[in-house]
Amino acid sequence: MSELKIAVSRSCPDCFSTHRACVNIDESNYIDVAAIILSVSDVERGKLDEIDATGYDIPVFIATENEERIPAEYLSRISGVFEHGEARKEFYGRQLETAASHYETQLRPPFFRALVDYVNQGNSAFDCPGHQGGEFFRRHPAGNQFVEYFGEALFRADLCNADVAMGDLLIHEGAPCIAQQHAAKVFNADKTYFVLNGTSSSNKVVLNALLTPGDLVLFDRNNHKSNHHGALLQASATPVYLETARNPYGFIGGIDAHCFEESYLRELIAEVAPQRAKEARPFRLAVIQLGTYDGTIYNARQVVDKIGHLCDYILFDSAWVGYEQFIPMMADCSPLLLDLNENDPGILVTQSVHKQQAGFSQTSQIHKKDSHIKGQQRYVPHKRMNNAFMMHASTSPFYPLFAALDINAKMHEGVSGRNMWMDCVVNGINARKLILDNCQHIRPFVPELVDGKPWQSYETAQIAVDLRFFQFVPGEHWHSFEGYAENQYFVDPCKLLLTTPGIDARNGEYEAFGVPATILANFLRENGVVPEKCDLNSILFLLTPAEDMAKLQQLVALLVRFEKLLESDAPLAEVLPSIYKQHEERYAGYTLRQLCQEMHDLYARHNVKQLQKEMFRKEHFPRVSMNPQEANYAYLRGEVELVRLPDAEGRIAAEGALPYPPGVLCVVPGEIWGGAVLRYFSALEEGINLLPGFAPELQGVYIEEHDGRKQVWCYVIKPRDAQSTLLKGEKL
């Protein structure tokens, strides 16, 4: 790890000594700097203000000559003053080094600092892991290349909990505890738990800490499958499902406004647990997506005000957000910034740090904000939460993952965190403007007009602080979502959502020609740009502080190029050479528009957009026949049979089935195959056969080839004698 540098102004007199490398202040972004030396003229031209605005708290010294006076208003913002002259160069150098070393030390947050110090001790390891600092790998040419590729420091930092000097990650002692306490402070939680197996595990930790068989769980039908696993399959809680929106482009929307009305919720309870419909606080837990995969953001204050008095706790699954409290216009949607009292629910928030924050893959965190209900029967104390935590945590954690979570908290601390996210928002707005100015067919998913003026006509600085430019106003055609209330939802500014041709925004119907987004996604991947996901006529790009305008302009350039290829109806071999080469016999002679038309017609023929919508509407939910846990146990006992999709109609699903991404179950174990879900998977099956090279990833069903055709198969519960007529004969 390189030593940090000293940034020095060209106009500074030569008045200090240092062994550190020096860089010109005007050529530095301050990222790799431990101390800064300015002249009085630098301060007067605003350099000190510029440095303070970073929020990095780098020590700043001012160098003077000829008895220059420093304006009094700057004295409280600097670490010291150096005066030109040979006599004190060494003395000033020691002051400089003291400040630089202190900054360098405090820059490293608690766990990372302890990890670096421990590795630097050079201890001789006779414990796990067996590669012991990478030395085992170095015994073989392949292993040596492995170490060389990742660097020795990673292997030296892969430690075992056998040495208590690094504390304990499972019972939260020492540096790990201090790191999590620091993160809790940064994210405004009472307590934070670092989780090293993704938010799938974080959700299960929370759900296993709260839910028991028979508990009512208010359940967003948009929830990620991990919530089904934890709440329904593991805990055997009873779900009360809330219907959610899909729009014609394939975007995942939010829960309908009427679903938050108490009278409606009590009607739903009466359907599944009538004896509990009149309880004052019937729900042990509500599980709500704070932000959907496709960037529909909830207002946490509204959610708590509407349903909080009915719930012991609310889990806001924030896998796809977590940065909202660092963006001023999004702050009201943050559950961690709420002022709560003893009558409110406890708040739990899970965040996938690896998604859009700064973390290695699988890094996640749980935030607990419930001190306002401490002492009440419904309160979940730390020991109970940690018991569930240890059920899901490995006893061999990878320390660099934990360190990444520690660093993420440090990066978000104070002004610097807000600055990074504001830069991200600004870049995202400017990228949308570029697309609006340069593309004719591919459009950003934002309002066309705001107060009667085009979205892009407003100044970026205004858009970046005003939610009106991202709100879903009920009834506006551009978004085509139904069932929303005023100020209920808005588009996440840090998710660049684009739509492709094929949907008439005025009525949500299919047009004669369309461009399914998977074709655009494959074109981008062919040209070195990787989108997060696509579905029907929508495509998603995640924006983080990693983005700069050069990267975003590259994306826009490729979008423009794709449109030109579309307009010229270029040969498919030119547009998608990899897919064409793999399936040349199928696509011989095809053009881009020909492929688009064929796929678009498939969607229109099956009305896939409507099927997607219906799957998440209460009227079309698959009927529940068994408790999900019972269905899963039947699957584990082998009381199932594998059948072709058409033969699954009327049968009980043994597995949850879904396309991935987004990882949202369409049918839950114990529900009956049929209706919109069956027709949706049938449409996917036809697409797999008709259009090779574009098959989606499907989970919970199996694609097998028979007689030259790929078929979708699924496990269903074997009929029991007493139920055979019902289970085999029922058609939906």
Task: Annotate each PLM feature.
Residues E173-C177, S396-Y399, T518:
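Alpha-helix N-cap/helix-start motif at coil-to-helix transitions, marked by capping-box chemistry
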Residues S2-A165, E173, K185, Y264, ...:
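Non-catalytic terminal extensions of PLP-dependent enzymes
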Residues I31-I36, L75-F82, D190, D215, ...:
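Conserved acidic residues
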Residues T192-Y193, T350, G528-E532:
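A short linear hydrophobic-aromatic micro-motif
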Residues H140-Q234, V240:
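Long, structured ligand/cofactor-binding scaffold of large enzymes
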Residues S9-R10, C22-D26, S39-D57, T64-E65, ...:
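Conserved PLP-enzyme active-site core in the AAT-like
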Residues Y193, A286-Q289, I539-T544:
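Short glycine-rich or small-residue beta-strand-to-loop segments that form or flank ligand, phosphate
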Residues L170-C177, L196-N197, I255-S263, E511-G514:
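Conserved phosphate-coordination/catalytic loops
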